[in-house]
C-alpha cells in the first residue's frame, strides 16, 4: 500500500485510534498485583534513523516503507533517540526550531523507524487486543504485520489502537515510523530540551470481547460534608454484566452493587486532601475482567471569589514540573517520579502543575496517593508564533489560537487530557495549555470542559490580551491566572472591581541560578489575601543533558548551544529548584522555609510568650509538630528545650510560653525549629526538619575597640605610603587607594594587591541589568586618586584618600572619600564615604577584595548561615556563629555566577589555623570566600570549565544587591537594590 502522508494535515489528527478513555489497566480475575492482561513491549527494538523524511522512501520504493530488519540498529524503548546518539539535542524556549509556516514543517525532517516482534497464541486471538503508546514525539505511523494500522499525534497523550483483526497466531510484527515534526508541533513549543522518539511505555492489553470501555467516577458531597454520593457513568463494548464493590482504604468492603450505573452512598465520608490523601477503592468485575479504581472524595468550590476545598480555604504551595532527566531525557520511570514527589513533600510543596503537557498517566495516580493538588495541563504551547516576524508581537502571539486550522487540534488535545485523567482525586484544575494566546478554539474547548466536568476548576493564563480584534470570552474559566506578576500588581488586583475571580500565579519566583530572591514578598501576599490561591514556582528541575565527567571527575551538564544547534536559548533551561541530578539548590531550601507549616511572632519579651500560627489547611499541630526552641545571646545558646504537645487547629494561632527568661542585652534571638512529630514511612522520618523561625529580639550595639597607640611610622613617596610598626609593614598605593601589601610577623598575608570591588559575576537573574552594569563600566573600573595624604597622629597613622571609579571613555560612577587609620598593632580602621552618580544603574555591590594564600581556607563568621544568603534570599539561613571552608561556601551552579555570599555579618575571620584576617563592622556587611575570581566566573559558561585562582578570594562588602527573579520575573525590587546615593562603610581589618 502506498504511503499517505498525514503529518502536515491538521484535519487528520488520528487514524485507527480508539475513542479516548480514562487510564486504567484491567486484570484477569485470578491476577494479584500484576496484570496478566497487559504485555509490555518495552525493551530492545530494531531501529533505523533517517536524517530526512525524504530518505524514508528511497528511489524505486514506490512510496512503500521497507520493513527489512537487515542492517538496522538497536534502540531501547522507551527512550529519546537523541540520547541514543542520533540526531542532536536542541534547547529552544520560544522560537520554533523550524520556519513558521503552519501547518507545514520542513521536508528535511528527521525520522526513526522502530520494529519489533511479539507472539500471539490461539487463545489470545479470541479476545480484543489493544496496542497502547503512552508517549511518542511528535507523531507516528503504525503498521502491524506490515499492514498500515493507523496514525496519531499529541506527543504526551495515550494513543490506543484496536489491532485485533491485524494479528496472526504465532509471530507478529509492529513497526512505527516516528516523525520529528508535524503540524501538531506548532502546538508543542514547550520551553524544554527538544527530543524525539517513543519515550513512554508501549504495551498490549488483552480484553474480553465484551468489556468496560470507559467510566467516569463522579462524587458529590453535601454542604456540611456529612454525606457523599459516588456515581459511576460507564461505557461498554458489548454488554458485559458488571458488579461494583466499594472498599475503604483499609480494604474493608463497604458496599456492593450490580448494574451498568453503580451508585454508592457514604455517611461521614473520609474526604481526600493533600495533607490526608485518603482514597477508597472501587472494584469493577465482569465475568472475565477486574478493574480497580482509586477514588478520592472532595468538594471544590469558589465562594465570594475564594477557593474552598472541603469547605476550607486552601493555599497552593506549588511547582511547575517537566518530565526531565539528564540521562533519560523525557523517559521518566515511576521511581524517578517518586523521587521528585518525595523531595517536594520533604520541602513542604503541596501542588504540581504538569507544565505544559500531561505527564505519564500513572503520575497523577502517584499525586493522588501521596497528596498533591494538580493543575493538569493539556499538551498545548504555541508562543513561538510571537516570534514569526523576528520580534515578539502580542497579536502574533495568538495566531495559532485564532487560526481555524488548529480548532480541531486544540479541542482534541484538551479533551484527551481531561478524559484520560478525569478519575484522579488530585486534579484541582483543568488547564487548557500554556502561552498560546486566546481565541475561538479555546472558547469552544473550554465550554466542552465545563460541561463535561463542572466539578473541577478551569485554568488558562494567556487571556489578558484581545489579539487582532477578537473579544475574549472567558466565561469557561473559573480562575484568573497570571505569571511573574509584580507584587504591586497583586495588591492592585485585589482592590480592582473588574477582577472577580480568585488569583493563581501559575508561574512565579523564577528559580534560575542563584535565586529566587523575592519569595517571601510573594508569600506575604498569599497569606494576606484569601482570593490569592497561591503560586507555582518556575520550575522544579534544571534541564540538562549529562555529558560524562572531566578528567578531574567533574560532572558535565550540557544545555542550549552545547549541541551546535540553532536556534537555542542557552542556559535558560537551567531554571529549577533542584540541579539536574536532583540535588537541591539553595533556592529550594529558601522556598521550603518560606512555605513552612508554622510561623511564629514574639508577643511579649518579658513573659516569653510567642504566638504560633498553623498554616496547614487540615491538620492540627498536635498531629505533626515537634518544636525545639533555643534562646540565643550573641550567637550562643543560653537556654533550650523541646515541646511536642502543642495543639493549634489549622489556620488558627496559639501562644506558647518559654520557661526561661529572654535576655535584655546583646544580640538576642529565639530560634524555633519545627520537625516531624512522627515517622512517615514514605516521605521522611520522625525529626525531619519542616522549617524554622528565628525571632530577632534585639541587635546589641557593637562596641568599637580602642585603637592601640604606640610606635608606628609612615613613609611616603610618589606612589605609595609605607606604614611600619613593631610587627608589621603595610604598603598603601597612592594610585589605587588600597593596600597592596600587608606583612605581619614577616608574612605577607596578601598574594596580590587589594582591589575596590563593585562587580559580581552576573547571576542568571542579573541577565538584563547586566547590560546596564556593563554599559556603566562596573565590570572594568579604573581608579583615579585625586589626593592621598598620610600623617602620624597620636600613636597611629592616618591615611586620607579621595578617589573615583570610572571605566574607559565614561565618566566616574562613584566617588569615595576614605580614611584608613593604622594603629600600633597593625589594625586598620576604615571609614569610606561614597557618592554615586544617580544617572547610573544600581550597584551590584560595594566593598573590597583581598587575595589570600590558598591555606587561608576557613571562614569563621557571625552572620547568616550556613547557606548562601542575600538581603532578599536568607530565609533558609539563621543568624549565628559558623565555620565553613571555601568549598563549603561555594554553590556549584552549572552556569557559574555570583554565589556563596553571606549577609548580615558582624564579624568574619579567614584563617589557616595559624594566621588570620578578621573584618568587623559596626553595621551588617556581607562576605564571600571562594577559590574563583568573579572575572573567571563571569567569562566561563559551565562550572566544569572553571579554573581555580592561585589564591583564595576574600570579598567583604558594605552591601550586596539582592538576587531577585528577574530572569523571567519582575525587576529587582527597589528596596533590594544597592541604589543609595550616598553611603558609609566602616570596618576594622585585623591581620594576625
Task: Identify the residue ranges that each predicted region occupies.
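An acidic-aromatic loop/edge-strand motif
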Residues: 80-83, 87-90, 95-104, 153, ...
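Short strand-edge motifs at loop-to-beta-strand transitions and within beta-strands
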Residues: 114-116, 157-161, 260-264, 652-658, ...
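Extended substrate-binding grooves/exosites of carbohydrate-active enzymes
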Residues: 2-33, 77, 84, 92, ...
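Beta-strand-rich binding/interaction modules
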Residues: 142-144, 226-257, 282, 609-644, ...
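An acidic-aromatic substrate-binding cleft motif
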Residues: 279, 291-351, 358, 704-766
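Beta-strand/loop-rich accessory regions of lumenal/periplasmic or secreted enzymes
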Residues: 82-85, 180, 273, 659-667, ...
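Accessory beta-strand-rich segments of carbohydrate-active enzymes
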Residues: 2-18, 31-32, 46-52, 72, ...
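Extended acidic/polar, glycine-enriched regions
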Residues: 168-171, 233-303, 664-666, 671-709
Amino acid at each position: 500500500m502506498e504511503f499517505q502522508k498525514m503529518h502536515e494535515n491538521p484535519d487528520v489528527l488520528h487514524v485507527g485510534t480508539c475513542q479516548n478513555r480514562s487510564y486504567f489497566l484491567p486484570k484477569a480475575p485470578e491476577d494479584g498485583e500484576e496484570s496478566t492482561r497487559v504485555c509490555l513491549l518495552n525493551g530492545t527494538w530494531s531501529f533505523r534513523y533517517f536524517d530526512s523524511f525524504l530518505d524514508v522512501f528511497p528511489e524505486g520504493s514506490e512510496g512503500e516503507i521497507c520493513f527489512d530488519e537487515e542492517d538496522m540498529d538497536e534502540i531501547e524503548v522507551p527512550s529519546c533517540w537523541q540520547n541514543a546518539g542520533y540526531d542532536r539535542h536542541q534547547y529552544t524556549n520560544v522560537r520554533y526550531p523550524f520556519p513558521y509556516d503552519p501547518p507545514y514543517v520542513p521536508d528535511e525532517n528527521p525520522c526513526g523507524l522502530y520494529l519489533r516482534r511479539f507472539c500471539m497464541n490461539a487463545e489470545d486471538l479470541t479476545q480484543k487486543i489493544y496496542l497502547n503508546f503512552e508517549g511518542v514525539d511528535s507523531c507516528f505511523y503504525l503498521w502491524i504485520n506490515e499492514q498500515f494500522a493507523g496514525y496519531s499525534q499529541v506527543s504526551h497523550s495515550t494513543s490506543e489502537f484496536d489491532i485485533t483483526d491485524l494479528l496472526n497466531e504465532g509471530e507478529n510484527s509492529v513497526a512505527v515510523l516516528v516523525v520529528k515534526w508535524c503540524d501538531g508541533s506548532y502546538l508543542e513549543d514547550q520551553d524544554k530540551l527538544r527530543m524525539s522518539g517513543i519515550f513512554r511505555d508501549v504495551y498490549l492489553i488483552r480484553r474480553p470481547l465484551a468489556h468496560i470501555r470507559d467510566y467516569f467516577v463522579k462524587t458529590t458531597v453535601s454542604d456540611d460534608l456529612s454525606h457523599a454520593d459516588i456515581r459511576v457513568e460507564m461505557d461498554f463494548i458489548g454488554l458485559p454484566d458488571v458488579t461494583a464493590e466499594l472498599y475503604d482504604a483499609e480494604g474493608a468492603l463497604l458496599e456492593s452493587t450490580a448494574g451498568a450505573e453503580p451508585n454508592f452512598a457514604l455517611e461521614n465520608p473520609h474526604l481526600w486532601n493533600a495533607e490526608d490523601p485518603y482514597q477508597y477503592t472501587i472494584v469493577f468485575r465482569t465475568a472475565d475482567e477486574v478493574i480497580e479504581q482509586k477514588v478520592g472524595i472532595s468538594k471544590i468550590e469558589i465562594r465570594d471569589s475564594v477557593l474552598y476545598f472541603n469547605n476550607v480555604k486552601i493555599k497552593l504551595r506549588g511547582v511547575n514540573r517537566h518530565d526531565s532527566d539528564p540521562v533519560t531525557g523525557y523517559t521518566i520511570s515511576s521511581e524517578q517520579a517518586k523521587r521528585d514527589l518525595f523531595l517536594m513533600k520533604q520541602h513542604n510543596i503541596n501542588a504540581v502543575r504538569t507544565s505544559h503537557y500531561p505527564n505519564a498517566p500513572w503520575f497523577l495516580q502517584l499525586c493522588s496517593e501521596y497528596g498533591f493538588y494538580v493543575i493538569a495541563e493539556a499538551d498545548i504551547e504555541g508562543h513561538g508564533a510571537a516570534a514569526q516576524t523576528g520580534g515578539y508581537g502580542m497579536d502574533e502571539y495568538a495566531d495559532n489560537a485564532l487560526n481555524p486550522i488548529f480548532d480541531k487540534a486544540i479541542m482534541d488535545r484538551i479533551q484527551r487530557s481531561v478524559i484520560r485523567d478525569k478519575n484522579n482525586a488530585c486534579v484541582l484544575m483543568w488547564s487548557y495549555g500554556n502561552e498560546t494566546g486566546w481565541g475561538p478554539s479555546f472558547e469552544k474547548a473550554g465550554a466542552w470542559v465545563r460541561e463535561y466536568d463542572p466539578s473541577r476548576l478551569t485554568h488558562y493564563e494567556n487571556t489578558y490580551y484581545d489579539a487582532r480584534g477578537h473579544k475574549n470570552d472567558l466565561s469557561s474559566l473559573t480562575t484568573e491566572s497570571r505569571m511573574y506578576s509584580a507584587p504591586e500588581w497583586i495588591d492592585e488586583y485585589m482592590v480592582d472591581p473588574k477582577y472577580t475571580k480568585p488569583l493563581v500565579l501559575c508561574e512565579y519566583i523564577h528559580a534560575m541560578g542563584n535565586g529566587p530572591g523575592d519569595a517571601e514578598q510573594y508569600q506575604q501576599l498569599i497569606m494576606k489575601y484569601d482570593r490569592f490561591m497561591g503560586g507555582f514556582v518556575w520550575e522544579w528541575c534544571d534541564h540538562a543533558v549529562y555529558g560524562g565527567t572531566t578528567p578531574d571527575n567533574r560532572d558535565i551538564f550540557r544545555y542550549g548551544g552545547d549541541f551546535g544547534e540553532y536556534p537555542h536559548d542557552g542556559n535558560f533551561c537551567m531554571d529549577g529548584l533542584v540541579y539536574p541530578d536532583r540535588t537541591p539548590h539553595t533556592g529550594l531550601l529558601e522556598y521550603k522555609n518560606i512555605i513552612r507549616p508554622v510561623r511564629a511572632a514574639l508577643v511579649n519579651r518579658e513573659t516569653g510568650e510567642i504566638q504560633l500560627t498553623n498554616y496547614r489547611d487540615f491538620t492540627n499541630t498536635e498531629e505533626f509538630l515537634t518544636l525545639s526552641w533555643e534562646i540565643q545571646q550573641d550567637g550562643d545558646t543560653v537556654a533550650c528545650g523541646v515541646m511536642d504537645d502543642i495543639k493549634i487547629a489549622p489556620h488558627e494561632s496559639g501562644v506558647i510560653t518559654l520557661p526561661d527568661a529572654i535576655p535584655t542585652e546583646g544580640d538576642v534571638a529565639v530560634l524555633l525549629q519545627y520537625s516531624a512529630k512522627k515517622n512517615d514511612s514514605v516521605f521522611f522520618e520522625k525529626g525531619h526538619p519542616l522549617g524554622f523561625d528565628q525571632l530577632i529580639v534585639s541587635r546589641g550595639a557593637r562596641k568599637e575597640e580602642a585603637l592601640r597607640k604606640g610606635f608606628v611610622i609612615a613613609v611616603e613617596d610618589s606612589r605609595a605610603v609605607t606604614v611600619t610598626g613593631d610587627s608589621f609593614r603595610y604598603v598603601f598605593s597612592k594610585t589605587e587607594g588600597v593596600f597592596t601589601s600587608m606583612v605581619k610577623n614577616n608574612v605577607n598575608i596578601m598574594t596580590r594587591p587589594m582591589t575596590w570591588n563593585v562587580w559580581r559575576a552576573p547571576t542568571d537573574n542579573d541577565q538584563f541589568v547586566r547590560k546596564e552594569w556593563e554599559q556603566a563600566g562596573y565590570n572594568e573600573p579604573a581608579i583615579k586618586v585625586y589626593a592621598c595624604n598620610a600623617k602620624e597622629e597620636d600613636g597611629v597613622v592616618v591615611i586620607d584618600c579621595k578617589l573615583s571609579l570610572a571605566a574607559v571613555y565614561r565618566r566616574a560612577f562613584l566617588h569615595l572619600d576614605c580614611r584608613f587609620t593604622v594603629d600600633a598593632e597593625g589594625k586598620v580602621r576604615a571609614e569610606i564615604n561614597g557618592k554615586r552618580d544617580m544617572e547610573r544603574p544600581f550597584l551590584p555591590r560595594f566593598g573590597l577584595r583581598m587575595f589570600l594564600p590558598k591555606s587561608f581556607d576557613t571562614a569563621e563568621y557571625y552572620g547568616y548561615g550556613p547557606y548562601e544568603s542575600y538581603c532578599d534570599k536568607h530565609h533558609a539561613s539563621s543568624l549565628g556563629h559558623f565555620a565553613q571552608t571555601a568549598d563549603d561556601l561555594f554553590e556549584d551552579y552549572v552556569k557559574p555566577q555570583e554565589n556563596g555570599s553571606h549577609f548580615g555579618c558582624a564579624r568574619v575571620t579567614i584563617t589557616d589555623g595559624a594566621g588570620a584576617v578578621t573584618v568587623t563592622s559596626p553595621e551588617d556587611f556581607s562576605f564571600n570566600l571562594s577559590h574563583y575570581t568573579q572575572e573567571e566566573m563571569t567569562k566561563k559558561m559551565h562550572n566544569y570549565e572553571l579554573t581555580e585562582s592561585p589564591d583564595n578570594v576574600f570579598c567583604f562588602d558594605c552591601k550586596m544587591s539582592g538576587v531577585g527573579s528577574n530572569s523571567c520575573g519582575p525587576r529587582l525590587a527597589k528596596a533590594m537594590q544597592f541604589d543609595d546615593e550616598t553611603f558609609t562603610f566602616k570596618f576594622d581589618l585585623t591581620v594576625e
